[in-house]
Every structure is written in structure tokens, then in C-alpha cells.
């Protein structure tokens, strides 16, 4: 209903003066239902349990992470928003030991990932590699960075597309910890 009101109001604007405003507002009005639909569908999704390698080239089964709520960050070293959010995620990993933080790198080698982490002074646990992109596809990730929040039962509770800030991550983590009571 809100999108229809917005379209009606934009339609009344003079074309010559506000053409670019109309385009932006109409695009936003059209994309909002798509965004809501994607999040609605994803709420029923369950977490895939792939087997991958970590940045030490050891095999890791995602099933080992099902004892706590999960924050899965999908990222790459070449992605500027990914690089900016890493210190925020590192701090959250230290502040929330009752959660599993998983950092799933896209398409890069262990050497590239480790060089990046060392150059930035990042001490991240659970750095996993998705060299082919198949794992991120199984999680429904098409944009970097994307952060997924799962219950211990593997139910997707929230999806954040784009870089996280301290405030947006804290809010999502509070929602995650409140929706999954401690055992």
C-alpha cells in the first residue's frame, strides 16, 4: 500500500523538474516488495551443511557449528565493504563467545586469505574457503558481503546484504541471542 501511495505522489510531480526524482522513487517503490519477498522466503530456509576447507587447508563440516547460533559472513579480500566490516565482525566474535562466527571467503586461495588477514592484523576464527562459489550458491548468496544469522537448528533468522556497521550488527546479534535461549 505504501508503494502505491508513493507511486501516486510521484506521478503528480512535474516531469521536467523532477524526472530523476521520479526514477529513483519508482525504482525504490518497485524494489521494496522484491526485497521483502526475498526476506520472507528466506526465513523458511534451513542452513545447508557442506564440507569445506579452512584457511589452514583442514576439512571442516558445517555440522560442527550446530550447537550454537551462527553468524555466517560471506566475503572476499577484493571487496571494499567486506574489508571495512572485518574489524567490526572480529570485535563481535570476541564479544559474543556464545555464537559461532563463520567467515566464508569467496573464490580465493588460503594463501591470499591468510596474507590479507595477517596484513590487517585480524584474528578471526572459523575462516572457511569457498573456492568454487558452490557453497555460497547453496546459501543463496549472490552479493558480497552478505551476513546470515541462523538458529542452532539451522533456521535462517535474518539476512543482511552489504557491509555491517557496529550498530546494525549489534541489533542483529541482540535479535539472534533473544530468539535462541541459552541451554
What are the roles of these predicted feature ranges?
Residues 71-72, 101, 147:
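Hydrophobic beta-strand anchors of alpha/beta hydrolase catalytic cores
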Residues 116-123, 130-181:
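Thiol/disulfide oxidoreductase modules built on the thioredoxin-like
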Residues 55, 77, 106-109, 130-132, ...:
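Solvent-exposed coil/turn segments that connect beta secondary-structure elements
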Residues 83-120, 131-137:
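Structural microenvironment flanking redox-active thiols in thiol-disulfide oxidoreductases
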Residues 49-70:
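A short beta-strand-turn-helix
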Residues 1-51:
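N-terminal targeting signals for export/organelle localization
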Residues 66-68, 98, 122-124, 141:
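Active-site acidic short loop of glycosyltransferases
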Residues 68-70, 75-78, 143:
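Short pre-active-site segment immediately N-terminal to redox-active cysteine/selenocysteine motifs
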Amino acid at each position: 500500500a505504501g508503494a502505491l501511495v508513493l507511486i501516486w505522489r510521484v506521478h503528480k510531480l512535474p516531469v521536467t523538474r523532477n524526472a530523476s526524482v521520479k526514477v529513483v522513487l519508482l525504482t525504490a517503490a518497485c524494489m521494496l516488495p522484491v526485497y521483502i519477498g526475498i526476506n520472507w522466503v528466506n526465513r523458511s530456509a534451513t542452513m545447508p551443511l557442506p564440507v569445506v576447507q579452512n584457511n589452514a587447508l583442514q576439512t571442516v563440516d558445517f555440522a560442527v557449528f550446530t550447537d550454537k547460533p551462527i553468524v555466517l559472513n560471506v566475503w572476499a579480500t577484493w571487496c571494499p565493504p567486506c574489508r571495512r566490516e572485518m574489524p567490526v565482525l572480529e570485535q563481535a566474535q570476541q564479544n559474543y563467545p556464545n555464537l559461532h562466527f563463520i567467515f566464508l571467503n569467496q573464490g580465493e586461495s588460503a594463501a591470499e586469505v591468510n596474507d590479507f588477514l595477517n596484513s590487517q592484523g585480524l584474528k578471526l576464527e572459523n575462516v572457511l574457503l569457498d573456492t568454487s562459489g558452490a557453497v555460497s550458491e547453496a546459501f543463496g548468496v549472490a552479493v558480497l558481503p552478505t551476513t546470515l544469522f541462523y538458529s542452532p537448528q539451522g533456521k535462517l533468522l535474518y539476512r543482511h546484504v552489504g557491509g555491517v556497521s557496529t550498530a546494525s550488527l549489534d541489533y542483529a546479534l541482540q535479535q539472534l541471542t533473544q530468539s535462541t535461549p541459552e541451554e
